[in-house]
């Protein structure tokens, strides 16, 4: 906040407003868990496993196979973002400035220029960091390649059984010309010509497109494809107050507070795809098992490998352990290990898995 308060002599009473950007994430996520955060900071959700399909045996006691207790995993969401702002509008200053600082108007300005951008940028960063599918591109998208990259993203999601509806493509603003001028965009999208004429981005291959200011897109990400059911962003408190002549102040005191957070739903993480710059995604670990001992390795120098043996996804699980070559995990016969690589400044790898046979 600037420190100057300009008292009017012969100035216009009109305030020059700045450009701003409406929220681009508000309709991008599921609200299925919002009510679960009422009255609590932490919510835990179950992921229930399934049983294997066996060959039926027509004799003996366990004809359907050997019964095993159905297992489950627990994923934890902890709401940590608690932000506030405050400012005053002194009655004397207001009188000497043509009352240009109206509390209601200034609060709306605060929301659109400070609060909304902060929440949008935070959400996108969290969702990108937790993306279930992260692919590093060999080069930045161009007019000749961007269409194929988007189709590849679609195919990767399809192969993970992500529903084909409720997907949204978030594209860096600087990449819009490459997409709008690509031959695939004109040929495949019936709204292509209209979009070019009006300057409004519509759909590409059936996917709604939203462009994002380059500075809002997570670092080293070209575009994100998000399925609505894969991301959540609960808002526990969204409170704004205007106090008139509170104790100690002749004028108005404006206060605001938001308690919120953003998460990727672990069991649906494949519904978030990011296309990144080259070398910005950790390589998927390799797993080798000998004498019931698991050896994990990653081709990404300096990466940390997280692993689980309870069936949960190591990228999101509270039971994940950090791998050390000095203390390799020991597996029972038939036990499965899952591993993923993480590193600061890079996006997480895919999950590798292997069963001790």
Residue ranges and their predicted role:
Residues 1-77, 270:
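N-terminal "assembly arms/tails" that initiate or stabilize quaternary assembly
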Residues 44, 50, 65-67, 73-99, ...:
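Structured, hydrophobic secondary-structure cores that serve as assembly/anchoring elements
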Residues 94-160, 276-278, 357:
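Alpha-helical scaffold segments that mediate packing/assembly in large oligomeric complexes
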Residues 129-200:
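Extended, solvent-exposed, turn-rich assembly/linker loops in the middle of proteins
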Residues 200-248:
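Glycine/small-residue-rich hydrophobic helix-like segments
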Residues 277-357:
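Short, compositionally stereotyped local motifs that mark structural "simplifiers"
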């Amino acid at each position: 906040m600037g420190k100057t308060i300009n008292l009017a002599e012969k100035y216009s009473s009109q305030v020059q407003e700045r450009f701003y950007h409406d929220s681009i994430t508000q309709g991008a996520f599921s609200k299925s868990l919002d009510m679960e955060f009422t009255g609590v900071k932490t919510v835990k959700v179950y992921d229930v496993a399934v049983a294997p399909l066996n060959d039926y045996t027509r004799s003996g006691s366990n004809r359907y196979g050997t019964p095993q207790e159905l297992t489950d995993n627990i994923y934890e969401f902890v709401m940590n973002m608690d932000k506030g702002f405050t400012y005053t509008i002194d009655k004397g200053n207001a009188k000497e400035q043509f009352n240009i600082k109206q509390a209601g108007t200034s609060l709306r300005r605060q929301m659109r220029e400070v609060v909304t951008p902060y929440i949008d940028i935070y959400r996108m960063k969290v969702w990108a960091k937790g993306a279930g599918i992260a692919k590093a591109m060999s080069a930045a998208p161009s007019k000749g390649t961007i269409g194929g990259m988007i189709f590849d993203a679609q195919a990767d999601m399809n192969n993970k059984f992500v529903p084909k509806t409720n997907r949204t493509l978030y594209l860096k603003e600087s990449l819009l010309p490459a997409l709008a001028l690509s031959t695939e965009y004109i040929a495949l999208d019936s709204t292509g010509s209209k979009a070019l004429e009006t300057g409004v981005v519509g759909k590409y291959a059936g996917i709604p497109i939203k462009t994002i200011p380059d500075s809002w897109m997570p670092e080293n990400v070209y575009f994100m494809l998000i399925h609505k059911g894969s991301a959540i962003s609960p808002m526990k408190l969204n409170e704004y107050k205007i106090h008139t002549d509170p104790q100690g102040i002749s004028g108005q005191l404006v206060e605001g507070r938001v308690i919120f957070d953003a998460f990727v739903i672990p069991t649906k993480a494949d519904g978030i795809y990011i296309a990144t710059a080259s070398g910005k995604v950790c390589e998927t670990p390799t797993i080798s098992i000998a004498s019931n001992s698991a050896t994990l390795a990653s081709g990404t120098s300096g990466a940390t490998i997280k692993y689980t043996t309870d069936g949960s996804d190591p990228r999101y699980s509270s039971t994940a352990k950090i791998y050390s070559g000095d203390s390799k995990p020991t597996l029972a016969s038939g036990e499965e290990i899952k591993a993923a690589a993480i590193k600061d400044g890079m996006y997480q790898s895919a999950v590798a898995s292997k069963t001790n046979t």
